[in-house]
Every structure is written in structure tokens, then in C-alpha cells.
From Swiss-Prot:
Its cofactor is thiamine diphosphate. This is Probable phosphoketolase. GO terms for biological process: carbohydrate metabolic process. Keywords: Lyase, Thiamine pyrophosphate. Belongs to the XFP family. Pfam families: XFP, XFP_C, XFP_N. Its EC number is 4.1.2.-. It is an enzyme of class 4 (lyase). It comes from Nocardia farcinica (strain IFM 10152). The keyword Transmembrane helix does not apply. It comes from the Bacteria. One of its GO terms (molecular function) is aldehyde-lyase activity.
Length: 822
């Protein structure tokens, strides 16, 4: 290690490599005596753990052999591609070291979140020192052989990623994309009263939008019910190539900012290891005492006022303990330490010599015996069993998840005597069922919404709970509750992040959002799906409860809000992910929505996206019919078909997916039955979009033979779809009759208008569907030309009516499904 610039780093050994300029190796240091809570022995022990973790971290980045430096480093000992990020690692290892101290002293149940997740070598090193790595990966024992394997696998083909990942013991936070650490930490703490989450936030990460809003997470943490989060802002001043904003504003301004977010920040700063150890130990003690005081007061019946939670601002150098100077450029304490401080260690003799000196500066001979095992004094520093942060079962939430108690959805269904004979708001019906789900599961189920719970018609949930709210309550506020089971905040990032943290630590939840604005969390969905994908391949990870979206206020019923609110493209984003992970459902009415959501809340390790309407909509299927239809995922609606010669191939297939497309398809089918009674029409409704894929492409996919039986091999298919038309083509391009498939859907035509004008703008309306049938069924262009002209005229009249009256024409607005005369 280096003494840092103030300690005379330039007195270290110099090496001049082929790259030119001086390269300065770090040297071992003596611990400075400083005031603090640590006695000499404890200070030395903590520093030994920190040195060991740093040594193991550097080894992971550079070495593929000779882990204990039993011989001078040679080129073949160095990896040919040096990948990783050392800059943040010493800070992560430092926090882990001191977290272990308070865990042991206080018997804490704690987990660790590495916001600068690209510092993956640090948590890997600590998990190996704690023994968890070897317990989970028997081929990586806690000795020299295991150390060599730990080093060799890092950022290496067939190995482990450079950042915290599902493969990392003790991690439930993916470290690839920055910004979500604090939200995951708060989500983990919800309903976990005994849990402490040590959350390290990178100062670069703190510049991201999601992290910037994450500080408000403490407004939803009830100290009487929930655990605690200790945010630690790692202020090492630099990102990849630039300084960080938080490091370059005056400290009083930073403190005022953090206090404004509801924290009591404690600053720990320095570049002398002995001094920093003492300061950080003192800060940890203060924070743990304050957290215990807050929780004790709340659980003893205090007035419930929102506390100011403690946090730590840790200001230490970027790449602390790495070579101070490389090829004449300052590295330690600068942006140059972000990734690999010695980039030419394999090919440059000077870099390689300095790498060896760097590794030896940690004095590994004091830390590991001659067989590479951590010395007993080091092992004694780790907590025991599940108290080890790398072994805490909370970080493997699938091992803790329990089935929800779910009421029978059939008891909440609506009566359907005849198809289309009644109307209901589908999501309002679902809200009644979710009310009971909430009541039956008061400790492991939460609903999240960005101020849209009532707008999406789920307000019945508030009959049994309130909105979680720890801030001030005004005279006219309603349904706010310190222990509420609904979290509403106008930030999709907060909703998604808290829910992810809640799910990753073994619980269940629902996120309801306007369809167009769920795009705000596209990237968060993407990262969570990747976590599910990767964790499914890790044998010791257990399946999590699914991430369940309920998207409403959707594209076809945002006619009043206009173009900005009209976007069904989240479905396209979701279906880019692996079929083993994602599911998309488009229930056409209230009963199918109930059946679908019952299935989703029972499922494991998926992302379920359900799109449903909140406006009054026709009820098509009874409870019994809905159960069968949803189990199939798609099927022929015989009552809507028309074929005077049963057993013959239909002349045309009308397919639909989504509530509004279903309505328009059935209206088109009624017109065809009335006006072209000899035309054989088959109506197919699709609830589970994955059924359109081939069986070999998705677990829900239909075999080709079944698909051809339903959709035929030659008849035209007119498919009315909720989203962008090309998505259906993506799903069906390998099917026999794909050339006969014509899809209508949203084609980015929108404005503030009426519901029917919206579908007309996108050629999804009943009249245009009839025109599509006439255009594509052989012979109809000639024989049904008059009907086609009527459809053109009907569209014109409908649009003219909206321009004159500001509402849809009654023949459309008052339409109901006609009972067949036969």
C-alpha cells in the first residue's frame, strides 16, 4: 500500500517501463495511531482483513497462476486480457470489513448492497474469506488451489462477470447498470424488521436519475415495521474519466442536500488507513446506535414522526493502495484508477514488476499460510453461519419465498348470461380480488403505483389498508397510513426499484402503471430480466416470485390525454428477452383478467406483463369459460363464429388480442354474419401472446400442427392486435400461413379524440376489418364491393360525427353483440 501523496508516495520504488515515464510502486505501511474506538489489536485485525480482501481483489483482476507469489511473476502468470474495475474496490472492502465488526458485536442480521457493482472483485474476495464461496462452489476451496481458481475465473471466458451478479454469494443486486442500489436496499428492508442493509452508493452512481430520486425511499420506511438501511456514499471523486458532482460541490452544500433528503450524514474522510479505520469504526457505532434508538422508540409506541436516518459519507481515494504513478501519470486518487491501473502487466516488464510489488505491499505472508489458507486470526473476524453477509439467506430470496394465500378468484367474477350482455371495468373487478389478497397477506405482499392506483381502478385495496406514508399528513389527506400496504409515489423508478428489492429478498408484489409510462423503467425491467435469466443457471439460487405488471390506461383508451399517452411498445421491449423469463397476457374482459392474475401471482421467476382496460367494457366469458380459455391461452370463440357448413375450413380467420381489438373484431364478425351470411368466419381470441410462438421457441408455444389447425394453412387471417402490428409478425414468421396473415394494430397515429376515432386512425376499427376481409378473401372484391363502399362511408360518417358532436356516433357507442337468429 501507499502512504498516499501526503505520506511521500514518491519515495516508493521507481520503475521505468517501455511506455515511458516513471511508474511508482506502493509500499507497505505502518498503521498510524489515532484516536477512536478500536484498540491496537482490533485495529490491526480489521486492517488485516482489508489488506487480504484487497490482495484477493487485485489477484482476480490480474492473475491466472502463481496466486501466492511463490515465484517472481512471469508473463504467463498474467491474464492476456485485463478486465475489471479496481478504483471502487478498496472502498467496498473497507465498508464490508467494518460492517462485519458491528455484525459480530451486535448480532446483526445484515446484507450488503454494492452500488458500484462493477467492483465485483471486492464482494467475491470477502465471500471467499468468509468461506461461503467454497461452500457454494466446491471447486474453489479456501486455500491456495481455490485462490488460484478464484483469480483465474474472474472476467474470463467460462468464468464470472466483473461486477456483482447472481453468481456472487450474498448479492441480490446486479451491478452492471448503475442507479438502483438504494432502492433495492429499501425494498429489502420493507417488512424485514430485524434486517440491516449496508448500501454503498457510488458517487458516480449518485448522478443517475433513479438514484437521485432514491433518497426519498426513507419516506416509506416505517421503523416500527421495517428494517433499516445505512446508506454509505462512497465519495472517491471520480468516474471513468471525469470528476463526480458530489465530490466537487462544497461539503456544506452536500451535507445540506443529504439533510434535506431526511438523513443525518456523518463524514469520514482521509487517506491514512489507520486514521480512516478509527473514524469509520466510530461512525459505524454512531449509526448503529442511532438506528437502534429510532427503532426502539417506534416499537415502543412513539408518536410516529419521521426520523432523520443516519448515513455515512466516505471520502477516500479512488484506487486507494494501487500504484500512485504509472508511466508518469498520477493514478491513485484519480480517474486513471477506475479500471486497471497497470494495463500492460503481461507485456511490459516494468508494469509486471510493479504489479508484484503492489501485491506484496499487502504482506500476504501475514494473511495466508503456506497452503494459501487464511490465517486463524483472519477467520475469526468473520461472523458465523447465516450472519455472514455472503451467506445471509435474505440475499437468496427464492429460499425464503412462501406461497401467497389467494382467495378463489371465481368468487369475485362477474355473471355473464350472454356474451356482451353486460359491462364492467375489468381492473375495478380485479381490485376487489387484490383487496382480499392484501388482507390475507399482510406481511409479504405490496402494491406499487406511481400515483395511479385509483386512476387504474384498484382503489378497493384501500378498504383494507392505506398508502404507506411516513411524511407529514395534512388535514384533507385520505388513506395515508404509517403501516400501509400500498406504496404510491410519482416515480416509476421508485416503484420498480422497491418492488425489485422486495421480490429479490423473498416477497411478492404488483406494480400498476399507465401503459405508455412504463417505458420509464424499460432499463430496470431489462436488468431484472437479466438477473432472472442468469440466476436460473446458478444451482444454489432458488426461484423468486414473479415481477407482475398491471398496465392499464392503455393506448386505446387514452383518447382524452392524447398522443403522448399512447404507446403500447413495452410489449416489444419485454419480448426481446428470453422466452423462459417473460410472459405477456392480454385478457379481453373482467373474468379473464381475474383468471390471468391469479395465475401470475402463483408463478415463479417470470416477468408477467398484463394489459387490461379500466373503462366499462363488455363481458364476454363466464367464470367457467374464462378459466378454460385462459388455461388454453387462446382459442376459438364458437359463439362468435359463423359457418353454415360445420367441419369445413373457414374462408377467413378473425384473430384478436386485447380488449379493444376484441370488441372491434366481434363487431366486424357481426357485420359479416349479417351482410355476408354465406361467408365462413372463424373468430380466435388470444390471451397469452406467447402461444403464437412455435413450441420449440417458447414453453407456451403452440406446436405447428395445432397452430395450423386453428389458423388454417391457407385462409386469410385478419389479426386485430393491441400493440404494434410487427410484433405479431415477429412471433409468427415461421408459421405455415404467415404469408396469409394481415395484422392491424397501433401504427403511431394518435391525438386527443374519441375512443372510436382512435381505432379508426390506426385502421383497427370494425369497418376497416370488414374491408380487410373483403380485400383478402378470394372473390369478395367483386361480389362484396357494395359492402366495402358502405364500410368506407360508415367510417366517414363516424369521423364527421366526432367533429360535430365531440363524441362517438351512437351506432358505435351503443353497439352490443347481437344474438344470432339461428
Amino acid at each position: 500500500m501507499t502512504q498516499m501523496a501526503s505520506a511521500g508516495g514518491d519515495t516508493s520504488a521507481d520503475n521505468v517501463g517501455a511506455h515511458g515515464g516513471r511508474t511508482v510502486a506502493p509500499v507497505p505501511y505502518e498503521l498510524t495511531e489515532a484516536a477512536g474506538p478500536l484498540d491496537r489489536a482490533e485495529l490491526a485485525a480489521l486492517d488485516a482483513w482489508w489488506r487480504a480482501a484487497n490482495y484477493l481483489s487485485v489477484g482476480q483482476i490480474y492473475l491466472m497462476a502463481n496466486p501466492l507469489l511463490t515465484e517472481p511473476l512471469r508473463p504467463e502468470h498474467i491474464k492476456p486480457r485485463l478486465l475489471g474495475h479496481f478504483g471502487t474496490v478498496p472502498g467496498l472492502n473497507l465498508v464490508w470489513t467494518h460492517a462485519n465488526r458491528v455484525i459480530r458485536q451486535r448480532g446483526l442480521d445484515a446484507v450488503f448492497v454494492a452500488g458500484p457493482g462493477h467492483g465485483g472483485p471486492g464482494p467475491n474476495a470477502c465471500a471467499w474469506l468468509e468461506g461461503t464461496y467454497s461452500e457454494l462452489y466446491s471447486h474453489i476451496p479456501r486455500d491456495g488451489e481455490g485462490m488460484a481458481a478464484l483469480f483465474a475465473q474472474f472476467s474470463f471466458p467460462g468464468g464470472v462477470p466483473s461486477h456483482c451478479a447472481p453468481e456472487t454469494p450474498g448479492s441480490f443486486h446486479e451491478g452492471g447498470e448503475l442507479g438502483y442500489s438504494l432502492l433495492h436496499a429499501y425494498g429489502a428492508a420493507l417488512d424485514n424488521p430485524d434486517l440491516t442493509v449496508f448500501c454503498v452508493i457510488g458517487d458516480g452512481e449518485a448522478e443517475t436519475g433513479p438514484l437521485a430520486t432514491s433518497w426519498h425511499g426513507n419516506k416509506f420506511l416505517n421503523p416500527g415495521r421495517d428494517g433499516a438501511v445505512l446508506p454509505i456514499l462512497a465519495l472517491n471523486e471520480y468516474k471513468i474519466a471525469n470528476p463526480t458532482l458530489f465530490a466537487r460541490i462544497p461539503e456544506p452544500e452536500l451535507i445540506n442536500l443529504l439533510e434535506g433528503y431526511g438523513h443525518e450524514p456523518i463524514v469520514v474522510a482521509g487517506d491514512d488507513p489507520g486514521v480512516v479505520h478509527q473514524r469509520l469504526a466510530a461512525a459505524m457505532d454512531t449509526c448503529m446506535n442511532r438506528i437502534a434508538q429510532i427503532q426502539r422508540a417506534a416499537r415502543d409506541g412513539a408518536d410516529g414522526s419521521r426520523p432523520a436516518w443516519p448515513m455515512i459519507v466516505l471520502r477516500t481515494p479512488k484506487g486507494w493502495t494501487c500504484p500512485p504513478v504509472v508511466d508518469g501519470d498520477r493514478v491513485e486518487g484519480t480517474f486513471r484508477a477506475h479500471q486497471v491501473p497497470l494495463p500492460a502487466a503481461r507485456t511490459d516488464d516494468g508494469h509486471r514488476a510493479v504489479l508484484e510489488q503492489w501485491l506484496r505491499s499487502y504482506r500476504p505472508e501475514e494473511l495466508f499460510d503456506d497452503r494459501g489458507r487464511p490465517v486463524p486470526e483472519l477467520l475469526a473476524l468473520a461472523p458465523e453461519g447465516d450472519r455472514r453477509m455472503s451467506a445471509n439467506p435474505v440475499a437468496n430470496g427464492g429460499a425464503l419465498v412462501r406461497d401467497l394465500r389467494l382467495p378463489d378468484w371465481r368468487e369475485f367474477g362477474v355473471e355473464v348470461k350472454t356474451p356482451g350482455g353486460s359491462t364492467h371495468e375489468a381492473t375495478r373487478v380485479l381490485g376487489g380480488w387484490l383487496r382480499e389478497v392484501t388482507r390475507l397477506n399482510p406481511h409479504n405482499f405490496l402494491t406499487f403505483a406511481p400515483d395511479e392506483l385509483a386512476s387504474n381502478r384498484l382503489q378497493d385495496i384501500l378498504e383494507v389498508t392505506g398508502r404507506d406514508w411516513q411524511a407529514e399528513v395534512g388535514e384533507y389527506d385520505v388513506a395515508l397510513d404509517r403501516s400501509g400496504r400500498v406504496i404510491e409515489v410519482l416515480s416509476e423508478h421508485i416503484c420498480q426499484g422497491l418492488l425489485e428489492g422486495y421480490l429479490l429478498t423473498g416477497r411478492h408484489g404488483v406494480f400498476t402503471c399507465y401503459e405508455a409510462f412504463i417505458h420509464i423503467v424499460d432499463a430496470m425491467f431489462n436488468q431484472h430480466a437479466k438477473w432472472l435469466d442468469a440466476s436460473a443457471a446458478v444451482p444454489w439460487r432458488r426461484p423468486l416470485a414473479s415481477l407482475n405488471y398491471l398496465l392499464s390506461s392503455h393506448v386505446w383508451r387514452q383518447d382524452h390525454n392524447g398522443f403522448t399517452h399512447q404507446d403500447p411498445g413495452f410489449l416489444d421491449v419485454v419480448l426481446n428477452k428470453k422466452p423462459e423469463i417473460v410472459r405477456v397476457y392480454l385478457p379481453p374482459d373482467a373474468n379473464t383478467l381475474l383468471s390471468t392474475y391469479d395465475h401470475c401471482l402463483r408463478s415463479r421467476h417470470y416477468v408477467n406483463v398484463v394489459v387490461a382496460g379500466k373503462q366499462p367494457q363488455e363481458d364476454w366469458l363466464s367464470v367457467e369459460q374464462a378459466a378454460v380459455h385462459c388455461a388454453r391461452g387462446l382459442g376459438i370463440w364458437e359463439w362468435a363464429c359463423h359457418n353454415d357448413d360445420p367441419g369445413t375450413t373457414p374462408d377467413v380467420v378473425l384473430a384478436c388480442a386485447g380488449d379493444v381489438p376484441t370488441l372491434e373484431t366481434l363487431a366486424a364478425a357481426a357485420i359479416l354474419r349479417d351482410r355476408l351470411p354465406r361467408l365462413r368466419v372463424r373468430v380466435i381470441n388470444v390471451v397469452d401472446l406467447m402461444r403464437l410462438l412455435p413450441a420449440e421457441e417458447h414453453p407456451h408455444g403452440l406446436p405447428d400442427r395445432e397452430f395450423d389447425t386453428l389458423f388454417t394453412t391457407a385462409s386469410p387471417i385478419i389479426f386485430a392486435f393491441h400493440g404494434y402490428p410487427w410484433l405479431i409478425h415477429r412471433l409468427t414468421y415461421r408459421r405455415t400461413n404467415h404469408d396469409g396473415l394481415h395484422v392491424r394494430g397501433y401504427k403511431e397515429e394518435g391525438t386527443t379524440t374519441t375512443p372510436f376515432d382512435m381505432v379508426m386512425l390506426n385502421d383497427l376499427d370494425r369497418y376497416h376489418l370488414v374491408m380487410d376481409v373483403i380485400d383478402r378473401v378470394p372473390g369478395l372484391r367483386e361480389t362484396a364491393a357494395g359492402l366495402r363502399q358502405e364500410m368506407v362511408d360508415a367510417r366517414w360518417r363516424a369521423r364527421a360525427w366526432t367533429r360535430e358532436h365531440g363524441a362517438d356516433i351512437p351506432v358505435v357507442a351503443d353497439w352490443t353483440w347481437p344474438e344470432p337468429s339461428r
